[in-house]
Swiss-Prot record:
Protein name: Large ribosomal subunit protein bL20
Known role: Binds directly to 23S ribosomal RNA and is necessary for the in vitro assembly process of the 50S ribosomal subunit. It is not involved in the protein synthesizing functions of that subunit.
Name of the gene this protein is made from: rplT
GO terms of molecular function: rRNA binding; structural constituent of ribosome
GO terms (BP aspect): ribosomal large subunit assembly; translation
A Pfam family this chain is assigned to: Ribosomal_L20
Native source species: Polynucleobacter necessarius subsp. necessarius (strain STIR1)
Family listed: Belongs to the bacterial ribosomal protein bL20 family.
InterPro entries linked to this entry: Ribosomal_bL20, RIBOSOMAL_L20_CS, Ribosomal_protein_bL20_C
Amino acid sequence: MPRVKRGVTARARHKKITDAATGYRGRRKNVFRIAKQAVMRAGQYAYRDRRNKKRVFRALWIARINAAVRQHDVTYSVFMNGMKKVAIELDRKVLSDMAIADKAAFAALVTRIKSVVNAAA
């Protein structure tokens, strides 16, 4: 069996890592050992934060809905309870966008839910 030299595969492997590390500061961008560690850690952060992003955006949507609903003298929890009672299945992302972009439609929605909640109470 002939001897296989690793030049081509090693260069390709190193190039893949150094290409992924472009834009990093200091030796992290061009020293293979350090770049490899930096790329691995960046991958871990990216994996973790793809999951955290979902939590962060949900919290943002809830804060926006709460702020918009309080302008109509309703709390977020009462509003969402009314949404369930009326059987309107708009998610928080759409409600948040509606509160910003289409204030008239959002106000109509809030008044409808207020009437249902007040009738039940």
